[in-house]
Swiss-Prot record:
Coiled coil: none annotated. Binds 1 Mg(2+) ion per subunit. This is Holliday junction resolvase RecU. The record marks 99 as: Transition state stabilizer. One of its GO terms (cellular component) is cytoplasm. The gene is recU. It catalyses: Endonucleolytic cleavage at a junction such as a reciprocal single-stranded crossover between two homologous DNA duplexes (Holliday junction). HAMAP family: RecU. Endonuclease that resolves Holliday junction intermediates in genetic recombination. Cleaves mobile four-strand junctions by introducing symmetrical nicks in paired strands. Promotes annealing of linear ssDNA with homologous dsDNA. Required for DNA repair, homologous recombination and chromosome segregation. GO terms for molecular function: endonuclease activity; magnesium ion binding; nucleic acid binding. Mg(2+) binds at residues 82, 84, 97, 116. Its main location: cytoplasm.
Length: 197
């Protein structure tokens, strides 16, 4: 014990319990930022080259309040975007979408659009690896769902229903988040899609 001046006794605080589950919200990080960090890790370790696709935007009007400051006031999407991420892993083309929800029992299919479903189907037709990463923020659970199962569910009623978590658990794979990489989805690709260890 350390004796402080004026007989001040420092109270020993008990170490707090550390949650085993990483919560992106508690760390000030969005699900998308965690995926981007994962992709940066994969790139730096020469495991895969996967990037977020830029969204093409048409700038219509810009205000210049000062010469050095331009402010975009009006802009539109040039075309409907396909999926969020694409790249190459072990010679395979990878293409995936990432969605986050606060719902506990399902994910709304309105989050997926017909042009995205069509794009995913085209990727699968070319033997690419296509999937969605689904993060249930309230439950702190993340799943990888192969695109074939998303497409099948979407076509039941043209994306009008919500996809139950039970369907995702039955047809997908839980991603166990970690420190490095944060969202290790390639582990699931290796084990369950490519058939490796």
């Amino acid at each position: 014990m350390v004796n402080y001046p004026h007989h001040f006794i420092r109270k020993q605080s008990k170490p707090s319990q550390i949650s085993k589950t990483i919560n992106f919200a508690n760390r000030g990080m969005s699900f998308e930022a965690a995926i981007n960090a994962t992709n940066n890790y994969y790139l730096s370790q020469k495991i895969a080259v996967i990037h977020k696709k830029p969204t093409p935007i048409q700038i219509v009007r810009v205000d210049y309040p000062r010469r050095s400051r331009a402010k975009i006031v009006e802009a539109y999407f040039r075309q409907a975007s396909t999926t969020d991420y694409s790249g190459v892993y072990k010679g395979y083309y990878i293409d995936f979408e990432a969605k986050e929800t606060r719902h506990k029992t399902s994910i709304p299919m309105k989050n997926f659009h017909a042009h995205q479903i069509k794009h995913m189907s085209q990727v699968l037709d070319q033997k690419g690896i296509c999937f969605v990463l689904l993060h249930f923020s309230t439950l702190r659970e993340t799943y990888l769902l192969p695109a074939s199962h998303l497409i099948h569910f979407y076509r039941i009623d043209n994306g009008g229903k919500s996809m139950p978590l039970d369907y995702i658990k039955k047809n997908g794979y839980q991603v166990n988040v970690s420190a490095f990489p944060q969202v290790p989805y390639l582990d699931i690709i290796d084990k369950n899609i490519l058939g490796g260890d």
